[in-house]
Amino acid sequence: MKTNHPKHIPITQIKKQLLSSLDKRALVLVGLMGAGKSVIGKRIATMLGLPFYDSDQEIEKAAQMTITEFFKVYGESEFRALEQHVTLSLMKKSPLVLATGGGAYINEDIRQVINKNGISIWLKADLDILMKRVSRHPTRPLLQTANPKETMKKLMEQRYPIYAKANLTINSYKESRHTVAQNVIRSVQNYIYTEINDRNNQHANQDRHC
């Protein structure tokens, strides 16, 4: 299957090629709180005509309480167990766009399922941008500490090496949400384009040796 290089085609045409090549895989956004996963994910889903799910919202539906309340009542370990159950259930609904919680991709079981059944996209942002964004939601459970900025910095140190294992990394800094969403779509199509060409080259090499 030959695919035009995404740099030379508009988003509307990329949509057709991407959806046909994506098959039943999910586009999964990973990254820290404040990276813009939910907002960007909704825009990507709208552009591609795919269903969008926010795993945190789905967790709250399943628990019938907010994540902040769940943390207070049951603790983080129980939350992570529920997060895994909900995330793996959502992956079965692919193709879709999924915004995951900040700790989801850190879970090896979740990460393996995402890597097998989806294309993972890390939305990366620096400390100041993240803090500016999360300050609008001061009830984030993991930031209920004496020094939220230092806590965020430690989370970055712990999690960024794991987020870096994602298939794609997209900077989520000062660009508009629309621009970041477009960057994601073009990068996904480029990833698929490379994937298809590598597969075709592999088949061609096998044929030569037959």
Curated annotation (Swiss-Prot):
Primary site of residence: cytoplasm
EC number: 2.7.1.71
Residues given in the record as ATP binding sites: 34-39, 140
Keyword Kinase: yes
CDD domains: SK
Annotated positions binding Mg(2+): 38
Gene Ontology terms, MF aspect: ATP binding; magnesium ion binding; shikimate kinase activity
Domain of life (superkingdom): Bacteria
Annotated coiled-coil segments of the chain: none
Binding site for substrate: 56, 80, 102, 159
InterPro entries: P-loop_NTPase (IPR027417), Shikimate/glucono_kinase (IPR031322), Shikimate_kinase/TSH1 (IPR000623)
Cofactor: Mg(2+)
Enzymatic reactions: shikimate + ATP = 3-phosphoshikimate + ADP + H(+)
Classification via PANTHER family: SHIKIMATE KINASE (PTHR21087), SHIKIMATE KINASE 1, CHLOROPLASTIC (PTHR21087:SF16)
Function, in words: Catalyzes the specific phosphorylation of the 3-hydroxyl group of shikimic acid using ATP as a cosubstrate.
Name assigned to this protein: Shikimate kinase
Species this chain originates from: Bartonella quintana (strain Toulouse)
